[in-house]
């Protein structure tokens, strides 16, 4: 039987840890067993404890001190060390064959865009440990206030989709922060990215450098031509919002198919 997990990705500050905590809270409410696997060697304490924590193997602070490296260099060193010691990860995961695992990943996108660290870990999980994985990429909703930032984030999401080679869900997080700043009609154009949004924004700025206008047009057209990037709205404090996103993840990972069928009751009580 395949194991099931979700990789939580996105830039720093996108709300990944909050999203992980919300999933755990929802699953506990409905009686599902789930655990957070922390893959960020610089992670801070969260509401729910990490069941598996890369910092038990190696931590960013220790590497920076002992190897005299900066934060980014130390992060890469930590993941290269993890790749050389995947037997540690195998042993830790080995105790959780039937539980749902939530992999909380670092926010540095170079771990999958510049060096194949996360893609290698994903391949190990899917091929060696028999995981059905879904990737969720979080982009914070305030980015929609600046169309250029939004399309930059959408391009990063598309990069993750292509390089990780996993079924993928993009999530527009922290939606509650922009409710008073954008109407539903315009928000829908961001959930299904409309290339014209970027052109409309740049068109209002007559002082824009023509080279930037052409670059923005190419970026917007690239996202539009691929047709891969769409977003689901997320409010982490809204149980219905969490349940909706989790239903998409469950459908992709085929979670329900791996559950044992329950025998029906022999006798049904009927109220008189």
From Swiss-Prot:
InterPro entries: Gpn, Gpn3, P-loop_NTPase
Coiled coil spans: none
Keywords attached to this entry: GTP-binding, Hydrolase, Nucleotide-binding
Residues under site feature: Stabilizes the phosphate intermediate: 72
Entry binding sites for GTP: 13-18, 173-176
Motif residue range(s): Gly-Pro-Asn (GPN)-loop: 70-72
UniProt KW Hydrolase keyword: yes
GO biological process, one term: mitotic sister chromatid cohesion
SUPFAM superfamilies in the cross-refs: P-loop containing nucleoside triphosphate hydrolases
E.C. designation(s): 3.6.5.-
Disulfide bond among keywords: no
GO MF annotations, alphabetized: GTP binding; GTPase activity
Enzyme category, top tier: hydrolase
Family assignment from sequence similarity: Belongs to the GPN-loop GTPase family.
Cited function: Small GTPase required for proper nuclear localization of RNA polymerase II and III (RNAPII and RNAPIII). May act at an RNAP assembly step prior to nuclear import. Promotes sister chromatid separation during anaphase.
Quaternary organization: Heterodimers with NPA3/GPN1 or GPN2. Binds to RNA polymerase II (RNAPII).
Stated name of the protein: GPN-loop GTPase 3
Gene name for this UniProt entry: GPN3
